[in-house]
Amino acid sequence: MQSAWRQYFIYSIVAIAFIFILARIILLQGFNTDCFIFNLDKCKTNLSEIAEKRQIASRSIDTNRGTIFDRNNEILAMSLPRKTLCINPSLLYNLKKEDLKKYHPLLEIIGEKKSNFLKIVKKFNKRKEYYLRRKVSDKTALKIEKLNLKFVYFIKEYQRVYLGGESFSNVLGFTDIDDIGQEGIELSKDDVLSSTKGIKKIRKDNLGRAIETIEIIKQPIAGQDIKLALDKNIQIIGYNILKKYVDKFSAESASLILIRNKTGEIISMANYPSFNPDLRHEMSGTKIKNRIITEIIEPGSTMKPFLIFAALNSEEFSKEDIVDTTPGFIRIGGKIIKDPSNYGKLSLGEIIERSSNIGAIRVAQQLEKKDLWENIKLFQFGDNLYTGLSGEQHGELKHHSAWDDSQQATIGYGYGISTTLLHLCNAYTILANHGKYIPLTYEKIEDISSIYKEEIADEDLSKEIIGFMTRVVQNKNGTGKRANLEKY
C-alpha cells in the first residue's frame, strides 16, 4: 500500500512538472494567458496580432545630398543611389552551424572572413539590423540577391561621386560614409547640402526583405543644391599647368587662385599635389588641404605695391621722389640684403618695376611705423575674410608697437608678415577695384546689384599703383616681362 502511494506521488510530481514545462513553452512561443479553450476568439485575435507584429517593421528612408554645380551648371559632386547589405543578427544567432554554412558564398562575394562573420553575429545577437557592407556596387548586389538567403536584405543609401576629379578635390573636400561633410566646401556648406532621413512602415517576407510599404511615417527631405563661382574648364586648365611646372622644377607644391574683381567671385582655386576623391585611402595628409586658405606664407616682393601705397598715402613721399639704392646692398639685423645689381637712383614706380629690395627697405625705414602698419592693414592682412571656407587661416601682421627697426625694414619687401594666398589676392582685388572692398565668395552671384562695396583705400592712389604694376610686365626693365600678354 505504501509502495503504491509512493509510486502515485512520483507520477503526480512528474505530471505537474511536465504541465509546467509545456505551459512555459507555450508562453515563450508568443501565447498569452488569455489563449485557452474558453477564449478561442480572443486567442485567434492575439495570434493574428503577433504574426502581424513579426511581419511589420520600420525602416529609414534615405534621400540624396544636394548637388554641387559650377557656375555654368556643370556637375562637380552628386549623390547616386547604392544598396547597403544588411543582416539580422538576432535571427542568424539561433541558426545551427550547418545552416550558417549556406552564407559562405555571400562572404566570398564581399570578401569577409568566416570567423569575423560569426563574431559579428555573436556580438550583435540582440540587434535586428546590422550593416554588413555599405554601398555595394550594383554588380555585387545582383550576385548576392541570386543567393536568396534568409535574414539578408538591402536598404537604399546614397554615395557621393565627384565629377571634377583631382582638380577640385581639395577645394570641394569630401564626405564620410554617412554622407556628412568632412573637408572643404562639403564641410562649409554641410548644413545646406545635408539631407534628412524619413521613416516608413514596411511588411517583410520570411527572409526579412521588405515586400510592401504600408505607410510613410516621415517624409525624407533632400539636400539643397549649390552653385559655385568656380568654372570647371578654367579649373582643369589651371590644375594641369600647376602639375606641369611642379613636375618640371621638382617643386613641393603650387597653388593658383583667380578672382573676378568686379564681383569678388572666385573663378578658380587649384592646388597641386591633390588626391583622387574616389580613393579614400588618399584622403589624408597635406594633399587634402586647400593650401590657398590654410598655408601661411611670407609674401615677399608681392608686398612692394602696398609699401609704395603706404609711402604715397603718407606725408613722407610724393610721386616725384627718388630713392638712392646705391651700392645695391644693405645690412639688416646682421644679414646682407642685395639687389641683383646696383640700380642706383629709382623712383617709387621703378622700385616696383625692378622689384628692388634695397629701395623697399629705404622707403620703409623713412615711414613712421604707425603709418606703415595702418596702410598695410587697410588691405585686410591678418583679418578674418569671412569667406565661409573651412580651415581658413588669417596670417599675422603684428602691431607696430611690437616692431623693432629690423622688422620695420623687412616688411618693406614682404618678410616679418605672414599671410595666405587668399589674403594676398584679396588685397590685390581691392587695388584692382580702385580702393573698393568687395567680399570674396566661392558661390556664384546671381544678382550683381546685391554686391556689397565699401571704399577703404584712396581711389586715385590705387589707380596709380596699378599703373606701376603694369610697368612690371610692359617695360624693358620690368621683372615680369614674360607675363606680358597681347590684348590683355
Q: What feature does the model see in each segment?
A:
Residues 1-280, 370-380, 481, 485-487:
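Periplasmic/cell-envelope proteins involved in peptidoglycan metabolism and beta-lactam response
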Residues 75-77, 204-214, 256, 260-301, ...:
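Beta-lactam-recognizing serine transpeptidase/beta-lactamase-like catalytic domain environment
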